[in-house]
């Protein structure tokens, strides 16, 4: 059994390792509210496209 088969072989059904950004597959800084499942960097990029507006 090689190293490649051992790496990331543990099942991830819950927790931070089981979720990723739908745009870039990043696992850090994930915004899950309202079912967005998008990281904070991608949210800043796509916020207007999604329908969020910046208030003054």
UniProtKB/Swiss-Prot annotation:
Cellular component annotations (GO), alphabetically ordered: cytosolic ribosome; cytosolic small ribosomal subunit; ribosome; rough endoplasmic reticulum
UniProt keyword annotation of Ribonucleoprotein present: yes
Pfam families named among the record's database cross-references: Ribosomal_S14
Manner of cofactor binding, per the entry note: Binds 1 zinc ion per subunit.
Cell compartments where the protein resides: Cytoplasm, Cytosol; Cytoplasm; Rough endoplasmic reticulum
Keywords: Cytoplasm, Endoplasmic reticulum, Metal-binding, Ribonucleoprotein, Ribosomal protein, Zinc
Cofactor(s) annotated in UniProt: Zn(2+)
InterPro entries, sorted: Ribosomal_uS14 (IPR001209), Ribosomal_uS14_CS (IPR018271), RIbosomal_uS14_euk_arc (IPR039744), Ribosomal_uS14_sf (IPR043140)
List of residues binding Zn(2+): 21, 24, 39, 42
UniProt keyword Ribosomal protein, yes or no: yes
GO molecular function terms noted in the UniProt entry: structural constituent of ribosome; zinc ion binding
Quaternary context: Component of the 40S small ribosomal subunit.
UniProt family annotation: Belongs to the universal ribosomal protein uS14 family.
Name this polypeptide is given: Small ribosomal subunit protein uS14
């Amino acid at each position: 059994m090689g190293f490649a088969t051992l790496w990331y072989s543990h099942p991830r059904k819950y927790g931070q390792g089981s979720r990723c950004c739908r745009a870039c597959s990043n696992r850090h800084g994930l915004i899950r509210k309202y079912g967005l499942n998008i990281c904070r960097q991608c949210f800043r990029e796509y916020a207007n496209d999604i329908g969020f507006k910046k208030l003054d």
